[in-house]
Amino acid sequence: MSHSGPWFPRRDGDPIVKVMFAVYAARIDRDQPLNGLESGERPAPETRPGWSTVTVKAASLNHHDLWSLRGVGLAEDKLPMILGCDAAGVDEDGNEVVLHSVIGQSGHGVGPREPRSILTERYQGTFAEQVSVPTWNILPKPKELSFEEAACLPTAWLTAYRMLFTNAGVRPGDSVLVQGAGGGVATAAIVLGKAAGLRVFATSRDEAKRKRALELGAVEAVEPGARLPQRVDAVIETVGAATWSHSVKSLRPGGTLVISGATSGDRPSHAELTRVFFLELRIVGSTMGTKDELEDLLSFCAATGVRPVIDEVLPMDRAREGFERMADGGLFGKIVLTGH
């Protein structure tokens, strides 16, 4: 599959360009996002001061990639854009590394006034043979984790880690409801919550997913909207409109709802505002996580034996199959694409 060796001229007189295999957004289609997904040769990363190029060994899919194909966070003038936020691989010195995909958090490698972005919003992503990121964004991969496992952590698992431990403020023994078991963030929240000594409740429309949630450590898994045996201290919300009312109603007085996504839409029919103010509930938005939190998450997984839940591993040239499965909602855990 490798195309990174030769150098190809584009046209007579143009500079020669090194190319590589990549999976990319060629067009924006809000209704049929996969219509814009293509794979083939793209220019390899160019050398840039303060940036490093990593050879990708594994990269994982996120709903962010589907949203990008719909044009959310990805402007037409940035196309074609190589997709993929997450990756683990080997840097220019042969070190095994993991990428933190929030660019501009620190100003490293970008201008001081450049707003924060996630890979694929401004800069080419990880579904390729190579990716270039600010050197500051590269972390050592713990030897205990495989490339496939490590590639699951920087987006969905980091998001869940920040939601639980930074924004929900939960402690061992507290209770938490995770909506939408099966999704990448939700699955991570179940596993991390169990490992941290929380009582985890989960929901899913799918009986097989509810069963898997129990196997991962949830004390109870119910259908969306079902009454829980107790009011919970916190809710981890990524589904959005379809589960919002249930999330608010499931909280104890003074409880915290942390939301990082809205895969079912962002306009719930009932905002439950009266309940929010009367019970003094906290609603906290959460996006991704910091480099320090990713370091903590990597160490946590290495030390505890906690591992990401991987639904399927596919070679990168079969990325479309992975996108189709993610769009259908049939996943439990992460889909990982492997390089070579």
Residue ranges, per PLM feature:
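C-terminal hydrophobic helical "lid"/dimerization subdomain
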Residues: 10-20, 291-340
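Glycine-rich phosphate-binding loop and adjacent beta-alpha segment
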Residues: 196, 242-309, 338-340
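NAD(P)H dinucleotide-binding glycine-rich loop of Rossmann-like/cofactor-binding domains
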Residues: 99-180
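N-terminal Rossmann-fold cofactor-binding loop
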Residues: 203-206, 238, 261, 287
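Mid-domain Rossmann-like dinucleotide-binding core that forms the NAD(H)/NADP(H) cofactor-binding site
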Residues: 10, 148-226
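A short acidic, Gly/Pro-enriched loop at the edge of an enzyme's catalytic core
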Residues: 227-235
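Short N-terminal strand-loop motif that marks the start
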Residues: 1-87, 133, 340
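Glycine-rich beta-strand-centered segment in the early N-terminal region that forms part
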Residues: 43-60, 72-112, 119-125, 142-144
